[in-house]
Amino acid sequence: MVLKVKMGDIGVAKSPESIETLLGSCVAIILYDRGKKVGGVAHVMLPKSRNAAEKNPGKYADTALPELLDRMTKLGARKDKLTAKLAGGAAMFKCNSNTIDVGKKNIEASKEEVRKVGLRIASEDLGGDIGRTITLSLKDGSVIVRKGAELKTI
């Protein structure tokens, strides 16, 4: 079964399921506990929330990661056993010098939040100007990244 994560949402599951999301300028924060075969994906739309009581914590990098960790530990994952991966953050629109590159800001914020909680980023597929679809296999923690006709594993 494939759990589809929508924009600004968080999905967690156990093996044998997989988790999938479609990304443009958004960034997927992907966590996996190999021992428990528990994984999760946060589909981050923006770098920072305006308040701590945000109704949709998956939308922002600063609120998505704590919520993702909480949901995964409830399924049996251990923070000290987690592997982190990142994908997305494409520059989907041509920007002039006065325009904020949301993809770049999402990448920076997501990396910072992962570092803040003491996790190491094992692999990533970030930036560029093409959207991508990612699929996290909860059997082994592999992440398939599809960009157009290109397919790779991170």
From Swiss-Prot:
PANTHER family: CHEMORECEPTOR GLUTAMINE DEAMIDASE CHED-RELATED (PTHR35147:SF1). It catalyses: L-glutaminyl-[protein] + H2O = L-glutamyl-[protein] + NH4(+). Probably deamidates glutamine residues to glutamate on methyl-accepting chemotaxis receptors (MCPs), playing an important role in chemotaxis. HAMAP family: CheD. Belongs to the CheD family. It comes from Methanococcus maripaludis (strain C6 / ATCC BAA-1332). The keyword Hydrolase applies. Its EC number is 3.5.1.44. This is Probable chemoreceptor glutamine deamidase CheD. GO terms for molecular function: protein-glutamine glutaminase activity. GO terms for biological process: chemotaxis.
